[in-house]
């Protein structure tokens, strides 16, 4: 099935990127003078979290521009930048893209409104769920 092939390739791309990011950690020999990822990780959470905020804003701006006739491909580029920096954050915190995909799979088919209400009722946010994921 084409959808299965796309899903497999997408997971493979995310897994390969996660492995590269992991290899850039200082503990694994990453050199902040030669690697952007190593530099972000070396600078700590403030550096990559700031980038996540910047990239999220750029996604919003690209989408707003697309509403006024700009090239929608810009949205894809900005989302790719956002995902990349989020993956740096995941690596820093010892988490993986597979855990995010598992959470999305868990939520598939459920009402977002009901999901949010349940988390609020249980006093749980997504951070608690991430800690419980394998």
Swiss-Prot record:
CDD domains: NTP-PPase_HisIE_like. InterPro entries: HisE (IPR008179), PRib-ATP_PPHydrolase-like (IPR021130). It is found in: Cytoplasm. Its EC number is 3.6.1.31. One of its GO terms (molecular function) is phosphoribosyl-ATP diphosphatase activity. One of its GO terms (cellular component) is cytoplasm. One of its GO terms (biological process) is L-histidine biosynthetic process. Keywords: Amino-acid biosynthesis, ATP-binding, Cytoplasm, Histidine biosynthesis, Hydrolase, Nucleotide-binding. Its main location: cytoplasm. It holds the Pfam family PRA-PH. The keyword ATP-binding applies. Pathway: Amino-acid biosynthesis; L-histidine biosynthesis; L-histidine from 5-phospho-alpha-D-ribose 1-diphosphate: step 2/9. The keyword Ligase does not apply. It catalyses: 1-(5-phospho-beta-D-ribosyl)-ATP + H2O = 1-(5-phospho-beta-D-ribosyl)-5'-AMP + diphosphate + H(+). It is an enzyme of class 3 (hydrolase). HAMAP family: HisE. Belongs to the PRA-PH family. This is Phosphoribosyl-ATP pyrophosphatase.
């Amino acid at each position: 099935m084409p959808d299965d092939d796309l899903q497999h390739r997408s997971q493979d791309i995310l897994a390969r990127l996660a492995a590269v990011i992991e290899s850039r950690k200082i503990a694994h020999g990453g050199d902040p003078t030669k690697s952007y990822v190593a530099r972000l990780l070396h600078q700590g959470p403030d550096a990559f979290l700031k980038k996540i905020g910047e990239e999220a804003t750029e996604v919003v701006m690209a989408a707003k521009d697309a509403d006024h006739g700009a090239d929608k491909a810009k949205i894809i580029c900005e989302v790719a930048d956002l995902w990349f920096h989020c993956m740096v954050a995941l690596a820093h915190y010892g988490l993986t893209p597979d855990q995010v995909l598992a959470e999305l799979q868990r939520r598939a088919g459920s009402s977002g409104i009901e999901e949010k209400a349940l988390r609020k009722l249980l006093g749980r946010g997504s951070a608690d769920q991430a800690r419980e994921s394998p």
